[in-house]
């Protein structure tokens, strides 16, 4: 790969459509697949070894890496490309496995304990990146996407109790609650937690298509925090993750309590649940203070001297973490305009009226970053990074092609695609950069540290 020095650390637009042999060799070298291959060899035992485990594993990895739509296309390329065969230990074209060999191998790869070892490889590679790239995981975002899959024709006794593909449905509504779009699919859901700035997945889960996002998000947060080196038992909690952006699917009290306990600021869009109400009186205030809040948690004050009364949003000053409160100030004093009710509200107060809202009243409604602030709007826009990662897994590496039959094969295929994603992220971060058109390539300190970890 040829990457300019001015490109970002993870320059996803510089990925080759067809990786060369040097890139493939570096990718295979970066995979910590020793425990998985040893487990597969023990599983095979003294059975026939016509096609070694390393060769079958190499074909499974090369299929998404080389962007082949089917396994047969990858096998055809191996038969005509001697250099590619040698990278995965196949000496002659007659020794290239058949497609039915790969089908059985994928079923074994997706069963226990190999499925757990496959996921552990992903975790190890994220931990490797997290230990080298210090800002990885500071700003995160999550989302779930539907994946097409085919059901298994028959289930044998003793097989893993994996969820079979089911029908999924997602409805999109407008501001009035009317359904504007319906998306249906048959298969699974892929839940991702992604770094916003680098577009690198930190955690993933595969679930049934009808499982809610808020049910899976706690597992994603714990997995991501573990991969980033957080001490999950430390009190008070210290998390490397500063913010987490998600859509309305994660707007649940349990999720907000978990993020509060993990010291993570939620950037979660709020569901509309109030029926016939537009505002409520803030607890601890009576009608004389003129302070109310709406469903999104925005604090307002009323100028009741004017006719008709005027409602204004109070000026947000900041989050007082030690007090567990959000501080607001009189908008007239803060913004410098005259309010007819100023003399009554701010009598004897040079700074003006201040209101402190205790977050414990409702963690869901009063997050550390209020929804009516520019900071929330900018942070929430980072959620599009998950959509770009989802697009790469589907368009680049065919995770949504629907060519895999059976739950075990599907889980194995998704696990391999996620390894390709995190493996290419490792190559992008460790790749030498070119200084100018005719300049020499050089390694950054991050690339040198990452290569040392891979070689060590």
Predicted regions and their residues:
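Short gly/pro/ser/thr-enriched loop/turn and capping motifs at secondary-structure boundaries
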Residues: 273-278
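Basic, amphipathic alpha-helical segments enriched in Lys/Arg and hydrophobic/aromatic residues
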Residues: 374-456
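Short amphipathic alpha-helical "interface-anchor" segments enriched in bulky aromatics
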Residues: 79, 280-323, 359-407
């Amino acid at each position: 790969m040829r990457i300019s020095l001015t490109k970002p650390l993870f320059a996803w637009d510089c990925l080759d459509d067809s990786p060369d042999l040097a890139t493939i060799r570096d990718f295979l070298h970066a995979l910590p697949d020793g425990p998985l291959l040893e487990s597969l060899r023990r599983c095979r035992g003294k059975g026939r070894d016509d096609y070694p485990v390393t060769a079958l594993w190499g074909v499974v990895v090369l299929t998404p890496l080389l962007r082949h739509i089917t396994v047969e296309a990858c096998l055809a390329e191996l038969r005509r490309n001697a250099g590619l065969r040698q990278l995965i230990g196949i000496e002659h074209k007659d020794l290239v496995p058949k497609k039915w060999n790969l089908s059985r191998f994928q079923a074994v790869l997706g069963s226990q304990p190999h499925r757990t070892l496959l996921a552990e490889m992903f975790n190890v590679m994220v931990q490797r990146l997290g230990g080298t790239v210090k800002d990885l995981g500071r700003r995160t975002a999550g989302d779930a996407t539907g994946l097409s899959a085919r059901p298994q024709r028959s289930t044998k006794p003793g097989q893993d109790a994996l969820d079979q593909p089911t029908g999924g449905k997602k409805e999109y509504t407008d501001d009035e609650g009317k359904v504007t779009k319906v998306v249906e699919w048959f298969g699974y859901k892929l839940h991702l937690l992604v770094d916003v700035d680098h577009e690198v997945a930190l955690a993933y889960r595969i679930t049934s298509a009808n499982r809610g996002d808020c049910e899976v998000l706690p597992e994603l947060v714990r997995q991501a925090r573990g991969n980033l080196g957080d001490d999950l038992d430390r009190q008070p909690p210290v998390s490397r993750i500063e913010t987490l952006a998600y859509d309305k699917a994660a707007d649940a009290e349990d999720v907000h309590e978990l993020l509060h306990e993990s010291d993570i600021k939620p950037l979660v869009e709020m569901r509309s649940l109030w029926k016939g109400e537009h505002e409520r009186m803030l607890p601890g205030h009576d009608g004389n203070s003129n302070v109310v809040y709406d469903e999104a948690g925005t604090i307002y004050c009323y100028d009741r001297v004017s006719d008709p009364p005027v409602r204004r949003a109070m000026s947000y000053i900041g989050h007082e973490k030690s007090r567990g409160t959000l501080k607001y100030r009189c908008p007239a004093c803060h913004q410098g305009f005259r309010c007819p009710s100023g003399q009554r509200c701010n009598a004897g107060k040079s700074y003006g009226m201040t209101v402190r809202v205790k977050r414990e009243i409702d963690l869901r409604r009063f997050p550390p970053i209020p929804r009516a602030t520019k900071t929330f709007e900018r942070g929430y826009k980072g959620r599009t990074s998950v959509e770009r990662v989802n697009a790469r897994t589907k368009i680049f590496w065919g995770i949504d092609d629907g060519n895999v039959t059976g739950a075990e094969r599907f889980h194995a295929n998704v696990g391999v695609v996620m390894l390709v994603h995190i493996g290419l992220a490792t190559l992008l971060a460790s790749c030498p950069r070119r200084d100018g058109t005719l300049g020499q390539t050089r390694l950054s300190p991050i690339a040198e540290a990452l290569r040392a970890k891979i070689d060590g």
